[in-house]
Amino acid sequence: MFPVFPCTLLAPPFPVLGLDSRGVGGLMNSFPPPQGHAQNPLQVGAELQSRFFASQGCAQSPFQAAPAPPPTPQAPAAEPLQVDLLPVLAAAQESAAAAAAAAAAAAAVVTAPPAPAAASTVDTAALKQPPAPPPPPPAVSAPAAEAAPPAAAATIAAAAATAVVAPTSTVAVAPVASVLEKKTKSKGPYICALCAKEFKNGYNLRRHEAIHTGAKAGRVPSGAMKMPTMVPLSLLSVPQLSGASGGGGEAGAGGGTTAVAAGGVVTTTASGKRIRKNHACEMCGKAFRDVYHLNRHKLSHSDEKPYQCPVCQQRFKRKDRMSYHVRSHDGAVHKPYNCSHCGKSFSRPDHLNSHVRQVHSTERPFKCEKCEAAFATKDRLRAHTVRHEEKVPCHVCGKMLSSAYISDHMKVHSQGPHHVCELCNKGTGEVCPMAAAAAAAAAAAAAVVAAPPTAVGSLSGAEGVPVSSQPLPSQPW
């Protein structure tokens, strides 16, 4: 079966091709071979065939097959990981779209203008009253918030934001009140029993009391018994000294000295400043504001002079005075104040005046009330007055002391580091409560015994027995 050609030539091939008696050679001669193909007969034949069909009106040779269509490109196979993530990505896009829609709805609710109110028939006076605060939004529990979908969570967040920015929200004033309370807080009930000064805590109070007592301020143990502050009895009977001229001399120039009931001596200076002196000397009765000045003063009653000048071998009781004296050899101390009687020089005018009164002056304004002795200074009179007081022997060491200072001296024996109380059998550096109670009972009994006979007869103890016939309690020591 022959194929159908697009040409109209249905004759045998040779006459159609123009093959006569000349044969194929004549056909080849009618079409000259192309240039460059003389060496390849197959290509020459194909070229001649294509030229022949082109001259006959055919697009291509009927012997050539139709070209195959180009291959259709195939989509690459999806990877397994992307296939698995497709549902997740789709769900995320849906949730994001839902959240955006919920936020837009909440914003529309917040920014929506209020609906026009209907005509009210209420009295206009009632409208002037302030509106009641709106009820608080319902609280959402934590489990419910966790279980809510993303869209519901966005709605809850938008509602919370609307409640926060509501115009009827109130401002808390509790922190401001607490700050004002802190600023106006009082110092507290920590008051010194000696000078009535207030402190904000117990530590500052104990540190302040150490100035009066001379003890180191330390932390009080929580289980320790707190004893009241005890004032030495000697401070209650410091003699009020005055000269014949009504308290002249030092007291008149620099102020006055007053004994107070709470214990101690209050000295008023010329500038009006009050200085409380709670530490008295056992030898002369002079009072000082702290233990340091008291101990330094006690050196004046001793004959020991441990400090010696390396230049002139002069000895001193105090190191500061020796150092001051050494400076005079080097010319470092300027002494412009000279004594007109002996030519001695002084660096301060008060030192010169004191020297003139004590050495060269014949005036003795400070006179003793119990004898005819007179003194140039108040300190000399105070040291002399102690001699007239009744001496009381110490039952521990036998030392004769004034009755006004025997209580201070007993502290050396009763509050020493090696003291053991005979009542409680404990070694302590503080006053034993049992010993203090026994001493108070003994003092009360001694006062009753020393009372007049008429008063003793009117008193009666238990069961009608006179007090004077009752046995006295034993001494605590």
From Swiss-Prot:
Chief place where the protein resides: nucleus
- GO function terms (MF aspect): chromatin binding; DNA-binding transcription factor activity, RNA polymerase II-specific; RNA polymerase II cis-regulatory region sequence-specific DNA binding; zinc ion binding
Give the SMART domains listed for this entry. ZnF_C2H2
Q: Which domain of life is it from?
A: Eukaryota
Q: Which PROSITE patterns match?
A: ZINC_FINGER_C2H2_1, ZINC_FINGER_C2H2_2
This chain's function reads:
Transcriptional regulator. Acts as a transcriptional activator that binds to purine-rich GAGA sites found in the promoter of many genes including insulin I and II and islet amyloid polypeptide.
UniProt-listed PANTHER family:
GASTRULA ZINC FINGER PROTEIN XLCGF49.1-LIKE-RELATED, PR DOMAIN ZINC FINGER PROTEIN
The entry describes its oligomerization and partners as: Interacts with BPTF.
UniProt name for this protein: Myc-associated zinc finger protein
